[in-house]
């Protein structure tokens, strides 16, 4: 089973709150185990961990990490790094090799990322070499490299569970009131 974490660079708390939250939620939904946030925004950490608590799974967020130290430590422990950028090689050309990786850090920038990232990454991968959303880049990448079907994943310890329906909506509350 793949171990995947997201490293979010350049998050600007006043500007990127919603998009960074959605990067984390998308990564969680598609099988990542956590997100490293290379800036200080406890609100992001709390919001995403609250979702994980209510909807299940063990997703974590580490706040205010040193991005370079995290990448170096990850690689020292045998992990690989995939930087999502519109300047990289196209995802279909790299997905097969990335899919074989057991321990993967996916780096997603907000503002302009340090040029050093391009050298530290094992892969610089693009979604069509066009400007795009970080959320879409994470979703497409995680779907294409999944070793298991990410959309059929079940989350343990969920307080709430959605029952898939063709029409309408149904949510089961798994917490029994005493």
Swiss-Prot record:
GO molecular function, one term: tRNA (cytidine(56)-2'-O)-methyltransferase activity
Disulphide connectivity of cysteines: none
Keywords: Cytoplasm, Methyltransferase, S-adenosyl-L-methionine, Transferase, tRNA processing
Catalytic function, reaction form: cytidine(56) in tRNA + S-adenosyl-L-methionine = 2'-O-methylcytidine(56) in tRNA + S-adenosyl-L-homocysteine + H(+)
Subcellular location: Cytoplasm
Biological process according to GO: tRNA nucleoside ribose methylation
Cellular component annotations (GO), alphabetically ordered: cytoplasm
Gene3D superfamilies, alphabetized: 3.40.1280.10
Domain of life assignment: Archaea
EC number, UniProt record: 2.1.1.206
Chief site of localization: cytoplasm
Residue positions binding S-adenosyl-L-methionine: 84, 109-113, 127-134
Subunit-structure text: Homodimer.
Family designation: Belongs to the aTrm56 family.
Function of the protein: Specifically catalyzes the AdoMet-dependent 2'-O-ribose methylation of cytidine at position 56 in tRNAs.
Name under which the protein is recorded: tRNA (cytidine(56)-2'-O)-methyltransferase
Species in which this protein is naturally found: Methanococcoides burtonii (strain DSM 6242 / NBRC 107633 / OCM 468 / ACE-M)
Upper classification of the organism: Archaea, Methanobacteriati, Methanobacteriota, Stenosarchaea group, Methanomicrobia
